[in-house]
Amino acid sequence: MGIRISHLRKQFASFTALDDITLDVRQGELLALLGPSGSGKTTLLRIMAGLEHADGGQVLFGDEDATRMSVQSRRVGFVFQHYALFKHMDVFENIAFGLRVRRGKERWAEARIRARVEELLALVQLQGLEQRYPTQLSGGQRQRVALARALAIEPRVLLLDEPFGALDAQVRRDLRRWLRELHEQTGLTTVFVTHDQEEALELADRVAILNRGRIEQLDTPARVYDTPASPFVYSFVGAVNRIPGVLAHGQIQVAGHALPSANPALAAGPVEVYVRPEDLVPDADGWPATVAWAQRSGARLRVRAILDAAGNEVEVELPASAGTITAGQQLRLAARHYGVFPA
């Protein structure tokens, strides 16, 4: 089932959390809401879940208007950053909780509940741990229990609020791969919030970049990284160098060299060229630069250099096979891919 968000607005006193947000989440896709603190990503997720209500706009689940629908009626699975597991219940009962609290015709028979929990234990790879309590589990295992509990009610949509935020780096990486595989198995429409760029780019089918209550870009991970729609997206997703220039007659004068404009709609005048460290490469016809600092980092060589003509400091990332580079060494650098925006 898809989700359609239309002209959503949310205000907290004088703070605008969401400013006319419109967004379609496709059926079966895994969508990341990525942005800094205060960008509105968690507020948007909570409104989807029914935990907050918008001041204006509409939320549709499929063709059904869910804007004022209760949390229970929406049938969403929600996973919190800090698990929210019941400490006095073992793994089995935590997973079964949402099924046991149902009333009337919606209440399942005990045999069906048990079968569903056992199915989920296998799905999240926790067979044999059903009698353990949350305090006896690792952080990664607790998050799997939380996810199984969210899936137990057979939700129409799965929503995750920074699901790996409380875990250490290696566990996060392992769980990211596992969650992607799980999504492929279930095909459930899933939206997750994160401030971790790597997490969003690795996991999601599409990424919505939020900033100050607005969506700056909604696109595939590859296009978000390779073709950012704004200076904010360039700066927030990955590292970037900003080099001042002047656009005139379709050419950008940058550090004594001319570059073709990458944006034909851009008006003449001062501009900034945005280029990622890995897109600055040695080139005999490039900008003269002086190395200020160089450091090997695994398979990469990180270099900080000064463009001689402009005096701008830039960061360069080269393969370690580029050889030894030392401070004071002269280089020539060219931008193989870049974006241009008004200064």
Swiss-Prot record:
Catalytic activity: sulfate(out) + ATP + H2O = sulfate(in) + ADP + phosphate + H(+); thiosulfate(out) + ATP + H2O = thiosulfate(in) + ADP + phosphate + H(+)
Gene3D superfamilies: P-loop containing nucleotide triphosphate hydrolases
Domain of life: Bacteria
Domain ABC transporter, chain residue ranges per copy: 3-237
Keyword Membrane: yes
Record localization: Cell inner membrane
InterPro entries (UniProt xref): AAA+_ATPase (IPR003593), ABC_SmlMolc_Importer (IPR050093), ABC_transporter-like_ATP-bd (IPR003439), ABC_transporter-like_CS (IPR017871), Mo/tungstate-bd_C_term_dom (IPR008995), P-loop_NTPase (IPR027417), Sulph_transpt1 (IPR005666), TOBE-like (IPR024765)
Main location: membrane
EC number of this enzyme: 7.3.2.3
Listed CDD domains: ABC_CysA_sulfate_importer
Sites where the protein binds ATP: 35-42
GO terms for cellular component: ATP-binding cassette (ABC) transporter complex
Catalytic EC class: translocase
Quaternary context: The complex is composed of two ATP-binding proteins (CysA), two transmembrane proteins (CysT and CysW) and a solute-binding protein (CysP).
PANTHER family attached to this UniProt entry: SPERMIDINE/PUTRESCINE IMPORT ATP-BINDING PROTEIN POTA, SPERMIDINE_PUTRESCINE IMPORT ATP-BINDING PROTEIN POTA
Family as reported in the entry's similarity comment: Belongs to the ABC transporter superfamily. Sulfate/tungstate importer (TC 3.A.1.6) family.
Annotated function: Part of the ABC transporter complex CysAWTP involved in sulfate/thiosulfate import. Responsible for energy coupling to the transport system.
Protein name per UniProt: Sulfate/thiosulfate import ATP-binding protein CysA
Species of the source: Xanthomonas campestris pv. campestris (strain ATCC 33913 / DSM 3586 / NCPPB 528 / LMG 568 / P 25)
Organism taxonomic ancestry: Bacteria, Pseudomonadati, Pseudomonadota, Gammaproteobacteria, Lysobacterales
